[in-house]
Amino acid sequence: FKLSKEFDFVTWDNYIEFQWGKAKPETVSRDHALLRSYKKKPFWVMEQQSGPCGWSKLGPTPTPGKLRLWTYQSVANGADTVVYFRWRACPFGTEELWHGILNHDGKPNRRYAEVSRVGAEMEELSKNYRALMPRARVAIIKSFDSEWSQSIHRQVEGLYYDSLLLDYYRPFWNMGIPVDFVTAEEDLNRYDLVLAPMLMMVSDEGKKNIETYAQAGGKVLFSFRSGIKDMYNNMLTETVPGVFADLAGVEVEDCLLYTSDA
């Protein structure tokens, strides 16, 4: 979030089905939402998959309609620029199997026709709008400090911070409710609901900001393991939920760990 302030726009590479697996639709939308949330502005997709992709072996070939679907998904989530990668498959090198709109022969094909259709549709649509920016009334606090801490101390086998964020995002995605990702320090008053999954580490400014939001009538949902560490990644000696105990109005005396093999 802080780094994005130094740039005119942020971007990411969107590969949905390639050598290393397939991404679920909600995962792609979540990642789009995260990029949009960094600056609260439209973002770019610098590389949008346009063919079968892989290094040592080919990934799945996008079936008819998927390039169009993925492009519209990007735009609907706030992208104002989508760049297909690549134009034509390279005949040599590490990514010689990384197909683009055109195959190695450079001849127009099914994917070329599909991208041409999308281009014509976008040209027509652009007459009425520049970019779509979903107006989110729900926010999820994304804490890189908590994510990095949890990557070292897993807490529970099979628990991953990134997957947990997706679990909180998915129900809103299923209902068509836009979600922003925020820091604990930024303005929360525009949101009706703020979720704080596994917010283990929070700055004094962030803690105060969340308290102010809640005291003004905002709704905050904490998950397990929230408020348990300081900003130096040290465990606190206060009873769980630590720095949020007063705001939550509870103390956790004991807990049970549920794992996939329990």
State what each model feature region is.
Residues 4-260:
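Carbohydrate-binding surfaces of carbohydrate-active enzymes
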